[in-house]
Design a protein with these regions (language model features):
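Short Gly/Pro-enriched turn/cap motifs at secondary-structure boundaries
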Residues: 36-37, 130-134, 200-205
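Small-residue (glycine/proline)-centered packing/hinge motifs flanked by hydrophobic/aromatic residues
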Residues: 15, 25, 189, 193-200
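Short, structured beta-strand segments at or near domain termini in extracellular proteins/domains
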Residues: 206-220
Length: 220
């Protein structure tokens, strides 16, 4: 788990080949936030195929409104109503380790697609088209990992030093961790928004966020 030396080298290759929109000095300086790389033991769990949609959010919050979404099948985003949603859901948030494990789907590259620069056409924010959703799935059958800013159970700590070796969330006071967000900035403005699609990219929650529910494996 974390941003590896090989992944940093892959970003440098993209930059040297004029694949970056701007100087990536700030990205490399902030890479410490996703390091050091460590091995994490992740127990089996269930995770939603994609973030909650507007229609799904209204199942739990009937009064939910979303001025950002274009349709009921679009990703729902929460801000002031996040705590209400989490109180109503019979599920939990993924830990940060679970989220990255799900996003990587067995890979160690920048995204599950490889070390190439992600394109904006890989962003998925609406799930009405089953064919398009299926084509966006990773090897675990998960779609839109990295497209929306997705909140995790962990509190934000700007590094992985002394982080647990299992997938438990790190707790405490302060904002939570968010992962992804490439679609929240669409249409892209040439500001290297593609970096938000990387499996290892992490940040602290500031405004609205999407939710991808998680549940334990059922017992027999």
């Amino acid at each position: 788990m974390g941003l590896s030396d090989a992944e940093l080298d892959a970003v440098r290759v993209i930059e040297r080949s004029d694949g970056a929109d701007d100087d990536l000095e700030a990205f490399f300086a902030g890479a410490v936030h996703a390091r050091p790389v460590r091995e994490v033991r992740v127990e089996p769990f269930l995770i939603a195929r994609h973030p909650l949609t507007v229609a799904q959010a209204r199942h739990w919050l009937p009064e939910y409104e979303d001025s950002f979404a274009e349709s009921d099948s679009s990703t729902a985003r929460f801000e002031d109503d996040l705590d209400d949603l989490l109180g109503a859901l019979p599920f939990r948030l993924p830990s940060e380790a679970e989220w990255e494990y799900a996003a990587r789907a067995g890979t160690t590259t920048l995204t599950f697609r490889g070390d190439g620069r992600p394109d904006e056409d890989q962003v998925l924010d609406d799930f009405a088209d089953e064919e398009r959703t299926a084509s966006a799935e990773n090897a675990f059958g998960l779609a839109a990992m990295g497209s929306a800013n997705e909140i995790c159970a962990d509190v934000w700590i700007p590094h992985f030093t002394d982080a647990p070796a299992d997938a438990r969330p790190r707790t405490g006071d302060g904002p939570r961790v968010v992962r992804g967000g490439g679609g929240d900035l669409s249409p892209w403005q040439g500001c290297d928004e593609w970096l938000l699609l990387l499996s290892a990219t992490r940040d602290e929650s500031q405004d609205f966020t999407a939710v991808r529910p998680v549940a334990p494996m059922p017992t027999r």
